[in-house]
Amino acid sequence: MAHAIKLNRSAPNLTTSQIHYPLGDALPPLGETLEVAPGVRWLRMGLPFALDHINLWLLRDSIEGVEGWTIIDCGISNPETEAAWETIFASQLSGLPILRVIVTHMHPDHVGLAKWLCERWQAPLWMSMADYLTAQWLSNKEGGAAIGAKMGSGGSADHLERHGLNSAEDLALIRGRSDYYSRMVPGMPPRYRRLMEGDVITIGGQLWRVQMGYGHAPEHATLRSEEHTSEL
């Protein structure tokens, strides 16, 4: 016989209570950065969603004797995000270039401006294969974007309706988002360097190990510092 489980919602969340925030409530203003570790800068870009921002990263780097920066994740493609990046380029890089762009996964807030950034700095894109190809297909006007235009958000509405979503209003909203992905990811760089599980990348003299996750995205890359137990 099954027994009901009673939840004590007034009990403290021990996991949350043990989290330590070294910077307290400090946040980097738009167009600025905060250094969270030597050579690691945190920045935020706005998003037009309920979750109204994304955390991005700049890591001081050196490749083949050239000093500069590695970007980790990009923000969505829109004029506001481009302008915020230009402000950062002008004021936060100490006059140094962007050497490469690493994208952790294919969601628009992470990959949206990858093409623009790579073209802006003639920098290579590093990304997992599954997420690069998925983003390439979804942003391609002859691929996922074209299917979305024909089927209504890539068939998402039909899929959700088959699984119980019966609100005509909600289904209409979903069908109206047929070009939702390609609006925020208008294109991808034509080539990339593949990230794989277990890769070790040297960024600014520090070693970062690539760990792949599956679920949040097809092949989500996390970078874990071999020296400081940091994760990005």
What is the predicted function of each stretch?
Residues M1-D25:
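N-terminal presequences and immediately downstream first alpha-helices
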Residues V36, F49-L51, L195, Y214-A217:
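A short catalytic or substrate-binding loop motif that flags glycine-/basic-rich loops and adjacent residues
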Residues E80-E82, T87-T202:
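Active-site HxH/HxHxD metal-binding segment of metal-dependent hydrolases
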Residues V66-E80, L173, Y181-R193, V200-T202, ...:
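Metallo-beta-lactamase
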Residues G39, L59, D73, H105, ...:
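Divalent metal-coordination and catalytic microenvironments
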Residues L30-L96, T222-S225, S230:
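Conserved beta-strand hairpin/beta-sheet module of binuclear metal-dependent hydrolase folds
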Residues L14-T15, V36-R44, R175-M184, G204-Q206:
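Short Pro/Gly-enriched beta-strand edge/turn motifs at strand-loop
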Residues R44-L47, H110, M212:
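Conserved HGGG/HGGXW glycine-rich cap/lid loop of the alpha/beta-hydrolase fold
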